[in-house]
Structures are given as structure tokens and as C-alpha cells.
């Protein structure tokens, strides 16, 4: 890997050329712009009814994939172009709240629709074909919550569900002539959907003014279907992975205690279980995770399950001082991780013109994540607030009796420091902050997952 600040790629007269970069510390192909709009409308005809309309819109310019643009092959860039197309998101939601209805203090209903578009575009250096893979996602969701206060007990119950539809298309374009041709898709090119519905109930009991107990339960059902219609680009796929069907029942529990020994201290302990149901990204796609490695579908992936614990201590003094520290841990069963895979008895296939090792998502036996975070806030001179936080996380996959390897997606030590000015009338807020992180050592990279050790920075070698 190199820092791509010494050159950039241009195409002139049907040829890719490397030209020097005359701007020191300028990295061509590393920036983009994003636009976000949000509008809410609130209508409250009386004390019992409340109507809320929520509109959100977000879009971007093209987003260069800077890490892929640093790949080299025979002293030349591997790619002349590699970028995400505009990432489009539109959401509209309607919420109605009703007080004193159905024996509840408050009932609310929310119905929402989201449309999401994204695309990936790449062209190898010296070649004319620009590959474009496009994804369109439509999500319709409905949720309802019922709340009742009975003496020192607060009870919530409700349901929520979502219908998710995915359309995946692809083509390639000759950048010189504009000619179009077919191309393999990122996700199955047939019908793709994932639907889920869940019901929950939670309870909060103020045992004493200083001690509160909370508990809850959630039950869920999900169904998934994904199919490949065009066999032209995936002749290596067997019939059992060309059509993936899954139905999963899930459940989780939670239990927590909050204790205030004094008015300035709070101690909290929480225990819970959790789950994550495989989606089409987990079980259905074919893609090159990194050079020389191709990921194929595995319809046998099961839901991940977790046991979680969190211990928190907070010291506060009105709105002038806050110190909070927590220690957390998660134990995963059937953790979904990438592992070497065989397909029709083969461990390697040719994909996108390159011989690649075959990988697929599998349920590893166990994994764990532990860590700690601390935060400090202090107000001074009435209108200024200093804020700092620091987080450390560590995780391993336990595969077999004694075999361990790093869990991917684990961040190195990271934190934030900042300063905020807020006027006395709250009409002006100005904030300055800085984000920082430590290095991630090479031996903490997951070699088979998505940590992408090939793009590790020089600091990881120290």
C-alpha cells in the first residue's frame, strides 16, 4: 500500500496516463461532498392527539474508494477508477400518538418508507470497461408502542415489523465508445427480500427512590429469500446456493438495576441476551473482499446470539460536572465470520479474471468482545463546556478448544476531545472537537475477515 499523493490517473486519447501531483499533501481521489435535508411537521389538535410527519433526504457526490486506488500491480495502479456512485436515501414517516386510549396512558403508531440507492464502479488501469453494480433497496416499516404507568411500575408493550426489498443490477461500459455489455451483479440478480416482525414487552419498577429494576423480553420471526436468475456469470454456483430460503425464530431478554447511593452518584448493572439474523449481505452475495479472495453464498448461516453485560458508574454535579465510566462484555455464540470454503470440491476459482481463494460466511463456535469507556464533561465560565472520552475494545474468535484469532471490525484505542460554547439564551452553539485513535497492531488483524491487512498503515508495523 502507498499514500496516493505522488500521482493521479487521467485518460487521454484512449490511454490511461499517470501524471505527477504538484500539490504537496494533496491526495487525489480521497474526498467527496454530502447533502442532508430534514423537515418535521407537528400537528396537535388537542391534548390527546399528536401527529408528526418526518421527511429526510440525503445524497452525495461520487465517493472514491481510496484504499483500492492505492493497489499496485507491476509498478502501476491496479485500478484507474474505483468509486461509489451517489449514495441516495429518502425517508418519510408518520407518527400518531394518542393519550388515554386502550387502557394505556399513551399509544403511538408509526408507519415509514425508505428508499436507498448505492452503486460501485471500477475500471482496471489500461482497460476500457468500467463496471457498474447498482443496488436499490425499498423498506416499508410499521411499529406500535403501548405505555401504562401503574403506581411505581411503568409497562411498555408493542410490535414492529419491516418489509425489505432489494434489486441488484449491473452492466459495464466502454469508456471510449459508450458501448454497454452485461456484468455480474453484487447480490443475486433475481428476487430478493427479507421481512421480519417482532413483539416486545418491558417493565420498569421504582423499588425505592434510589433503586430501580428494569426487565424485558422480545420475540421475533424473520423470513428471507434470494435467487440467482442468470447463470452466465456464476457457473461455479451449485443449485443449493442459487436459491436461498431462510426462516428464523428469535428471542432475547434483559435485566437491569440502577442504584443512586447519593444524589451525585449512580451505579448501573445490565444483563441481556441478543441476536442478529443473517441478511442477504451475509448469505447471498458474491464479491471480492480483497485481492485474491472471493466470497460466495452460504445458505446454512444461522443467527448470531449474544450474552451481554455492562457495569456503569457515574458521578455528576448538576450540569457542571459529569464523569462516567463503564466496563462491558459480549459473548457471541454462532458468530458469523469469514472462513475458507469449498465449492463443488474446489478451494479456488477464477473470479473477475483472477484466480481467487474461496471464502464464505460461517458460524464460528464462539467469540467475545470486552472493553471499557470513560467520559469527562466539565462546565467553566458559565458558557463553556470541555468534553473528553476514551474507549478501548478487544475481541477474539474462539474456534476449537484452544485456537484463537482476532475478531474483525475491532477498533483500536480511540477517543474524542472537544470544547463547546453555548450562549445563555441557547441561541448560539459553537463546538470544536478532535478525534484520535491509536494503532492497530498487525497481530490484531483478522487475516480471513474484513480487516483488510493489506491496507494497514505504517504505524501497524511498529
Where is each model-derived feature located?
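Transmembrane beta-barrel wall of Gram-negative outer-membrane proteins
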Residues: 4-62, 88-92
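Outer-membrane beta-barrel translocator domains and adjoining extracellular loop/strand segments
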Residues: 6-7, 64-72, 119-127, 167-176, ...
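Acidic/polar loop-and-plug regions of large Gram-negative outer-membrane beta-barrel proteins
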Residues: 7-21, 58, 65-83, 106, ...
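Extracellular loop and loop/strand-boundary signature of outer-membrane beta-barrel proteins
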Residues: 22-27, 75-84, 95, 125-134, ...
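Face-selective signature of the C-terminal outer-membrane beta-barrel domain
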Residues: 42-58, 85-235, 249-254, 258-266, ...
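Outer-membrane beta-barrel signature, preferentially recognizing the C-terminal barrel domain
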Residues: 79-95, 100, 188-196, 241-256, ...
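Gram-negative outer-membrane beta-barrel transporters
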Residues: 208-209, 221-222, 328-331, 341, ...
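C-terminal structured "cap/appendage" subdomains that terminate the fold
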Residues: 459-462
Amino acid at each position: 500500500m502507498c499514500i496516493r499523493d505522488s500521482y493521479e490517473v487521467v485518460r487521454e486519447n484512449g490511454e490511461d496516463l499517470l501524471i505527477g501531483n504538484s500539490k504537496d499533501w494533496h491526495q487525489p481521489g480521497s474526498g467527496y461532498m454530502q447533502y442532508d435535508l430534514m423537515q418535521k411537521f407537528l400537528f396537535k389538535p388537542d391534548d390527546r392527539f399528536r401527529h408528526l410527519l418526518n421527511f429526510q433526504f440525503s445524497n452525495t457526490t461520487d465517493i472514491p474508494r481510496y484504499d483500492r486506488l492505492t493497489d499496485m500491480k507491476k509498478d502501476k495502479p491496479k485500478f484507474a477508477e474505483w468509486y461509489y456512485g451517489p449514495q441516495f436515501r429518502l425517508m418519510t414517516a408518520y407518527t400518531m400518538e394518542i393519550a388515554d386510549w386502550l387502557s394505556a396512558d399513551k399509544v403511538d403508531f408509526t408507519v415509514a418508507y425508505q428508499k436507498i440507492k448505492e452503486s460501485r464502479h471500477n475500471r482496471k488501469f489500461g482497460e476500457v470497461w468500467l463496471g457498474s453494480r447498482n443496488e436499490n433497496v425499498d423498506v416499508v416499516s410499521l411499529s406500535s408502542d403501548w405505555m401504562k404507568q401503574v403506581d411505581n411500575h411503568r409497562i411498555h408493550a408493542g410490535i414492529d415489523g419491516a418489509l425489505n426489498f432489494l434489486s441488484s443490477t449491473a452492466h459495464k461500459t466502454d469508456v471510449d465508445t459508450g458501448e454497454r455489455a452485461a456484468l455480474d451483479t453484487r447480490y443475486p440478480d433475481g428476487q430478493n427480500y427479507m421481512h421480519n416482525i417482532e413483539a416486545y414487552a418491558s417493565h420498569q419498577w421504582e423499588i425505592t427512590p434510589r433503586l430501580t429494576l428494569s426487565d424485558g423480553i422480545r420475540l421475533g420471526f424473520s423470513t428471507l429469500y434470494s435467487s440467482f436468475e442468470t447463470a452466465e456469470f456464476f457457473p461455479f454456483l451449485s443449485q443449493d446456493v442459487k436459491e436461498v430460503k431462510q426462516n428464523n425464530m428469535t428471542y432475547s431478554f434483559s435485566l437491569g438495576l440502577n442504584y443512586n447511593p447519593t444524589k451525585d452518584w449512580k451505579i448501573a448493572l445490565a444483563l441481556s441476551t441478543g441476536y442478529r439474523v443473517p441478511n442477504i449481505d451475509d448469505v447471498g452475495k458474491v464479491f471480492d473482499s480483497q485481492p485474491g479472495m472471493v466470497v460466495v453464498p452460504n445458505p446454512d448461516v444461522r443467527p448470531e446470539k449474544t450474552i451481554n453485560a455492562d457495569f456503569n458508574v457515574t458521578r455528576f454535579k448538576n450540569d457542571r460536572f459529569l464523569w462516567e465510566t463503564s466496563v462491558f462484555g459480549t459473548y457471541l455464540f454462532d458468530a458469523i465470520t469469514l472462513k475458507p470454503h469449498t465449492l463443488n470440491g474446489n478451494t479456488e476459482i477464477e473470479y473477475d479474471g483472477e484466480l481467487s481463494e474461496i471464502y464464505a460466511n460461517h458460524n464460528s463456535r464462539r467469540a467475545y468482545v470486552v472493553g471499557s469507556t470513560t467520559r469527562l464533561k466539565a462546565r467553566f465560565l458559565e458558557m463553556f463546556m470541555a468534553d473528553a472520552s476514551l474507549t478501548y475494545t478487544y475481541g477474539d474468535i474462539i474456534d476449537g478448544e484452544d485456537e484463537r484469532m482476532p475478531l474483525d471490525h475491532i477498533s483500536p484505542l480511540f477517543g474524542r476531545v472537544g470544547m463547546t460554547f453555548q450562549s445563555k439564551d441557547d441561541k448560539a452553539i459553537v463546538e470544536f472537537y478532535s478525534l484520535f485513535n491509536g494503532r492497530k497492531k498487525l497481530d490484531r488483524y483478522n487475516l480471513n475477515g474484513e480487516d483488510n491487512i493489506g491496507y494497514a498503515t505504517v504505524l501497524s508495523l511498529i
